[in-house]
Amino acid sequence: MPRVKRGVTARARHKKVLDQAKGYRGRRSKVYRIAKQAVMRAGQYAYRDRRNKKRVFRALWITRINAASREHGLTYSVFMNGLKRASIELDRKVLADMAVMDKPAFAAIVNQVKTTIAA
């Protein structure tokens, strides 16, 4: 049985990990064994935070909508309930963007909601 020379594949594997660890501090970017652990942990954080990002942004949108609707005398929950009753199908992302960037349009929506609630 011929002997297996693994120099090329080992070097390629090490290079791949060390390339992924570029920019890390100290031995985390220089030493394969430590870089491998750092890259693995970075991947775990990335996986976790891709899911957390969705929650964080939804919370931000809700906070912005709440702040903007309170300026017009409505709480977030009353405002969202009024939106559903008025059959206005705008998602939280769009509403939050309007609350920050386009205040007159948001005010118009709030007025529609107020008339729906009053009726």
Curated annotation (Swiss-Prot):
One of its GO terms (molecular function) is rRNA binding. One of its GO terms (cellular component) is ribonucleoprotein complex. InterPro entries: Ribosomal_bL20 (IPR005813), RIBOSOMAL_L20_CS (IPR049946), Ribosomal_protein_bL20_C (IPR035566). It comes from the Bacteria. Gene3D superfamilies: 6.10.160.10, Ribosomal protein L20. PROSITE patterns: RIBOSOMAL_L20. Belongs to the bacterial ribosomal protein bL20 family. This is Large ribosomal subunit protein bL20. The lineage of its organism: Bacteria, Pseudomonadati, Pseudomonadota, Betaproteobacteria, Burkholderiales.
